[in-house]
Amino acid sequence: GYDCSGFTQTVYSVFGINLLRNAREQMTQGEVVASLAEAQPGDLAFFDHADRDPKATNISHVGLLLDNQKIIHCSGKVHIDMIDEQGIHLADGELTHHLVQIIGLMIRYQRSQQLNR
């Protein structure tokens, strides 16, 4: 199975975008998106675990935004869950990961496609 960053790396490789291997490294690629409301489908969202102190950021998870309410991510198997400004929520509402940052990689991809026309 995939881990979270291996999953995002594989998805982006289909579009010719080479992501670094782990979530912390992937967070350095692309442009910071100010809020979930401004994010585009395909942007990457980065998280720490919900059971940790939210002020002690330790990036441990990454997922791919489907829209500003759903995220696809992988932890042994692929999941589609709800996301909000707090983070990832299971169907029962349990918060599993705190949202730390969103990186807009689709902006770069779209620009490159426009330049190649």
Predicted feature residues:
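Well-ordered beta-sheet/strand-loop patches within structured domains
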Residues: 40-43, 96
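Catalytic cysteine-centered active-site loop
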Residues: 1-41
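Aromatic- and glycine-rich peptidoglycan recognition patches
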Residues: 24-25, 57-60, 65-117
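A generic structural signal for residues embedded in beta-strands
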Residues: 46-47, 73
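Short secondary-structure boundary micro-motifs
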Residues: 29, 47-49
